[in-house]
Amino acid sequence: MRVTDFSFDLPDELIARYPMAQRNASRLLTLDGNTGTLADKQFTDLLGMINPGDLMVFNNTRVIPARLFGQKASGGKLEILVERMLDDKRILAHVRSSKSPKVDSIIHLDGGYEMKMAARYDALFELELLSDLTILEVLEAVGHMPLPPYIDRPDEDADKERYQTVYNQNPGAVAAPTAGLHFDDAMLDALKAKGVNIAFVTLHVGAGTFQPVRVDNVLEHKMHSEWANVPQDVVDLIAQTKAAGKRVVAVGTTSVRSLESAARASEGELKAFSGDTDIFIYPGYQFQIVDAMITNFHLPESTLIMLVSAFAGFDHVMAAYQHAITQKYRFFSYGDAMFVTKKAH
């Protein structure tokens, strides 16, 4: 299986650089994983596709303003992108500058804050905040929303709201769980009123989600690691849902990866899970938990299009993407969505 198998040509004008005026105003392409049948819908039509008793699982991570700008002691400019918060004072981060800062050197951030370069681990740096404030307080004060590289514009005030789900709760992500961006409070209320059950897991999406796959053979790819939490109450709800013959619908690839990570950690029998996961899902993977998923359109050759292909069949997914391009769907984080049902193995 070659990475290039997952390639497609995307016209630049189909990359969504801004969100729709209303969250749920996006289009929705439905894909039946068993038959490959496609249908063009609106996102609000999803209400008619989720049944009473089905369980929808959302990722409630909160995107932190993870991009910082500052200067080295020499005066050279640098940019810091937080990969994860280690504690209240320390971060693991990518640092972009003409020359890498030295260990033990001081970095002067915008706003007058200072950080010490504590250690280096290959491409990542450990930085320590020299302040009475917490990392989160400094990020909220001077950090910028970490828009993906393909959005290709500076972040704006509106992104602080729109590059964030309405149900976000646990700060720590440096990229949004984008399938969730389409839901507003009214739609969540309508789902609950219909008898759909709602549950939340947490996966702090890392910057690694944008890293290209740099090997030719898919099997040689080393997945980045992210922190996930699947609490016991969600495990219990999933068991009840399955026992009643209803579906588990994951909102986004991060929810899929959280649930499947928990199943993998307990060898197929779902138990509560909290810790790092580097689960890499590609065609051939047997899904343990998830029956249907909502997801945006992903980058060519990305691990995310591989995951969707594993779920609904490679040929079906690549055909769906060609259809989406022909029909001018909007792609990537601020783009349109798919509702995909699982292909039976």
From Swiss-Prot:
GO biological process, one term: tRNA wobble guanine modification
Gene Ontology, cellular component aspect: cytoplasm
EC number: 2.4.99.17
Pathway linked to the protein: tRNA modification; tRNA-queuosine biosynthesis
Subcellular location(s) per record: Cytoplasm
Record carries keyword S-adenosyl-L-methionine: yes
Sections of the chain in a coiled coil: none
InterPro entries the UniProt entry points to: QueA, QueA_dom1, QueA_dom2, QueA_sf
Catalysis performed (reactions): 7-aminomethyl-7-carbaguanosine(34) in tRNA + S-adenosyl-L-methionine = epoxyqueuosine(34) in tRNA + adenine + L-methionine + 2 H(+)
Entries under Gene3D superfamilies matching the protein: QueA-like
UniProt entry tagged with the keyword Cytoplasm: yes
GO terms of molecular function: S-adenosylmethionine:tRNA ribosyltransferase-isomerase activity
Signal peptide: none
UniProt KW keywords: Cytoplasm, Queuosine biosynthesis, S-adenosyl-L-methionine, Transferase
Subunit-structure text: Monomer.
Function: Transfers and isomerizes the ribose moiety from AdoMet to the 7-aminomethyl group of 7-deazaguanine (preQ1-tRNA) to give epoxyqueuosine (oQ-tRNA).
Family stated for the protein in its record: Belongs to the QueA family.
Descriptive protein name: S-adenosylmethionine:tRNA ribosyltransferase-isomerase
Origin species: Shewanella sp. (strain ANA-3)
